[in-house]
Curated annotation (Swiss-Prot):
Organism: Mus musculus (Mouse)
Gene from which the chain derives: Inip
Job description of the protein: Component of the SOSS complex, a multiprotein complex that functions downstream of the MRN complex to promote DNA repair and G2/M checkpoint. The SOSS complex associates with single-stranded DNA at DNA lesions and influences diverse endpoints in the cellular DNA damage response including cell-cycle checkpoint activation, recombinational repair and maintenance of genomic stability. Required for efficient homologous recombination-dependent repair of double-strand breaks (DSBs) and ATM-dependent signaling pathways.
Assembly notes: Component of the SOSS complex, composed of SOSS-B (SOSS-B1/NABP2 or SOSS-B2/NABP1), SOSS-A/INTS3 and SOSS-C/INIP. SOSS complexes containing SOSS-B1/NABP2 are more abundant than complexes containing SOSS-B2/NABP1. Interacts with INTS3; the interaction is direct.
Listed GO CC annotations: nucleoplasm; nucleus; site of double-strand break; SOSS complex
The keyword DNA repair appears for this protein: yes
Record-given protein name: SOSS complex subunit C
Ranges that cross the membrane: none
GO biological processes: DNA damage response; DNA repair; double-strand break repair via homologous recombination; mitotic G2/M transition checkpoint; response to ionizing radiation
Amino acid sequence: MAANPSGQGFQNKNRVAILAELDKEKRKLLMQNQSSTSHPGASISLSRPSLTKDFRDHAEQQHIAAQQKAALQHAHAHSSGYFITQDSAFGNLILPVLPRLDPE
């Protein structure tokens, strides 16, 4: 049984059309970017992964900050000790502050 050549031809035409549309859009964006070089604030960055990464990092930072705040409030409410928020090599959100006692 042979492969359907008309179906394959349609797929190739569809791919070519999609690639042509993408190329046209890319050229349009590049032209906009080049025309706005006189206005540095109006330039369009074509690197979306860095924007997505920055957004993800910011969201992660906010989530960690919320967790730190909750852990700190819980520790202060249920303990007589003193705690601070600080990055820890072991992944702890808060660290206890231990007083130094003079040796007797």
